[in-house]
């Protein structure tokens, strides 16, 4: 699943995920309020010619107002492919796996 699919899945079923990490995806159709309780870490590349970074930046700003835990990493010069293949670093994966889904 790509980054846009992660945004859609996380917003449709926020109660299923302890945290999400959409990479090089477009959240344009997502309501930020649906992710208010879901930690989000997203990665975008400035050289990505498929996904525009501006909507992601704007969405993450809205989400940060609702959610205390949001991270946007912008990788300088990374293409769409490089963003999709290089984003899964130990640091980022540890961030994901250190979250525990609430039973609430």
Model-assigned labels for residue ranges:
Residues 1-37:
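Primarily recognizes the serine-hydrolase "nucleophile elbow" in alpha/beta-hydrolase
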Residues 39-43, 49, 53-104:
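C-terminal catalytic histidine-bearing segment of alpha/beta-hydrolase fold enzymes
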């Amino acid at each position: 699943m790509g980054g846009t699919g992660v945004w859609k899945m996380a917003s449709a079923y926020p109660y299923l995920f302890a945290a999400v990490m959409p990479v090089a995806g477009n959240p344009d159709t997502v309501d930020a309020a649906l992710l208010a309780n879901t930690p989000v870490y997203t990665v975008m590349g400035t050289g990505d010619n498929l996904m525009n970074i501006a909507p992601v930046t704007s969405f993450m700003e809205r989400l940060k107002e609702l959610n205390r835990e949001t991270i946007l990493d912008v990788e300088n010069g990374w293409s769409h492919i490089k963003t999709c293949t290089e984003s899964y670093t130990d640091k980022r994966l540890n961030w994901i796996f250190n979250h525990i889904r609430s039973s609430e």
